[in-house]
């Protein structure tokens, strides 16, 4: 029996299936940055500091392991790698019923929503296929693109998670980022599993997820799995 089937069988007879709160495929540099400085429409992941070996290309060098896989959702031509990296890319939508993201992940605007034509980075068919809750202090009405509905909420992590779990209808909730949002949910101790892909680059400045991943080991088990692509997959799950 697979782990998935065991979980499904255990849920039979329970009033409510356990819903996990998950971070998946979250990319950081070796020095712990998930985005560079100065994020904008032209540079969604910001810019890296200049290093002796040159300047990292963002997001290319940070997330190239995912772009290169056969299961990358934006792939327009046949091909791509299989193996460990592809497994994580392919696993991204499994049992996810809702996502929570920060406003910075949704788009580059700050303050009041002046440009309502902006509907995210993802075009007419976003890759989420679930309700998405965008954390913001400014009101904006919900809207749908294909099978994804974006809701804009001014809420602390606990309340945002309550709404997302209700919308997920028994499935898991993904904390999608950006960096500040993942940090907030870690600080609130609301995350059950965390997958971070550490790229073999340094960014030097910007938004930092951690100074050291070892700071999480009082709360999480850790398995570190290197990939032939050069990234190291860090898999955390609650103690």
Language-model regions: role of each:
Residues 2-239:
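Enzymes that bind and transform nitrogen-containing heteroaromatic metabolites
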